[in-house]
Amino acid sequence: MDKLEIAQYLLEQVGMPQKQHSTLCCLALLAMAKLTKETPCVQATNDWVRIHDIISFIGEHYGVIYAENSRETFRKQAMHAFRTAALIEDNGKATNSPNYRYRITTEFLRVIQNMNEADNVVCEENVCLVQFVSKH
């Protein structure tokens, strides 16, 4: 599986609505985890990021260019739903603050890092995924 398929698989497994299985949402999740096409899932991170950082990462590493004025689209289609599902959290600043940031929750980071990419097969036995789904 490639990284987009892995992201889509994770979003499906945690019960995200079909609308959040879109390319935009999958790329946003990968960018937040700082996963390029070559980076193993075990190296995923949960650093604080702005939507601008997400858009830049996607353009640089996946070749998909989004205009800066699409930040609100990312916020509405991905971030709100991800936050509601406890996949990500924000830093509590005002949304119009230049210091407003998002990051993947520690719990969901463990899910991503425990994805088995060996032999291009996603491991169905991701214990962290099972635990995450059972709590949310």
Describe the residue ranges of each PLM region.
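Short acidic, hydrophobic short linear motifs in intrinsically disordered regions
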Residues: 38-67
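Generic structural signal for hydrophobic core residues of well-folded globular domains
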Residues: 32-36, 58, 86
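Short amphipathic alpha-helical interaction segments
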Residues: 20-24, 51, 65-85, 89-90
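Short alpha-helical segments that sit at the start of domains
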Residues: 1-48
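Short, amphipathic alpha-helical interaction segments positioned at domain boundaries
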Residues: 91-92, 97-136
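Short, compositionally biased low-complexity segments
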Residues: 1-2, 50-53, 130-136
